[in-house]
Amino acid sequence: MNTGKPQKRAVNGVLLLDKPEGLSSNTALQKARRLFHAEKAGHTGVLDPLATGLLPVCFGEATKFAQYLLDADKAYTATLKLGEASSTGDAEGEIIATARADISLAEFQTACQALTGNIRQVPPMFSALKHEGKPLYEYARKGIVIERKARYITVYAIDIAEFDAPKAVIDVRCSKGTYIRTLSEDIAKHIGTFAHLTALRRTETAGFTIAQSHTLEALANLNETERDSLLLPCDVLVSHFPQTVLNDYAVHMLHCGQRPRFEEDLPSDTPVRVYTENGRFVGLAEYQKEICRLKALRLMNTAASAA
C-alpha cells in the first residue's frame, strides 16, 4: 500500500549545514535527513540550541568516518555580555549575579591573553557530558551539581572583533572539547567580574568554513539533484591522513579481513586512506609497521564506494 511518504534512499556524503538558532543539533540533523530522504544520518559534534553555524552532517557510509571529525580543531565567534552571570552560561538562563561592567579594553585584552594556550577547563553543568549514563544538563535542570574534573584544552587564539562594554565579540580558535561558555566566564573571572554568552556561531571545523555551508531554507528550495550536488565525498572527513593506492587483490584482502603487505615511512598505528588504482575510496586501514601490514579499520560498503 502506498502511504504517500517519500521513499528513503541510500545517500552517501557530507553536508555542511548552517544550523539555525533555536534548533537542537539532532532536530537540525533530522530536518536535513528528511530533505534528502536519507536512510541514515549522523552529525559530528553537538551545537547548543542557542548556537548557530557549521554542523557537518554525515549521510550513509560517511557516518563510519564521523568520529574523525570530532577530534578536529574548531573556530567560533562569540558575543559576551560582561557584568552578568547566567544560570546556564548563556542567554537562555536566568541572571543569577551581577558585578562591574565598566571593563576597559586593556583589561579585556589581558584576560584574553591569559586564557590563550594550553589551559585547564572545568566543563559546564549545562553540557552533554555523561555522568552515570545521563547528560549533565539533566542534573542541572533539577538543580543538582555534579563535581567535574578539569580537562586540558588548547585555545590557539582569541581575537577581539568588537568591544564596547558591556558587549564584547571574540573570535576563538580552539581544540576539541573547549566550551566557549566556560571560556567566556573564565575571561570575566580573570578581570573580577561575570559574563555570559548572548550569541555563539561556529565558523570553522577541520578546515571546513561557514562560507561552504548551506541553510535548511536554501536546501528546501532545491530539487533532489541540486541538493545531492552539494554533498561532499565521504573521504573529506579523513583527508588529513596519509593515503595510498592498492591493487584490486590487496583491496580484496582488506575486505576479507586479511592484511596486505605495505611498507611506508610512517609511525606504527597510523590510519591510512586507501584508494583503488582507479581512484575509488576504499576506507581507512591501520599501518602495522612491525609486520609491514595494513589492517582494515573502517571500510566503505563495496556497493556504495563503487557508486
From Swiss-Prot:
It catalyses: uridine(55) in tRNA = pseudouridine(55) in tRNA. One of its GO terms (biological process) is mRNA pseudouridine synthesis. Keywords: Isomerase, tRNA processing. It is an enzyme of class 5 (isomerase). GO terms for molecular function: pseudouridine synthase activity; RNA binding; tRNA pseudouridine(55) synthase activity. NCBIfam families: TruB. Belongs to the pseudouridine synthase TruB family. Type 1 subfamily. This is tRNA pseudouridine synthase B.
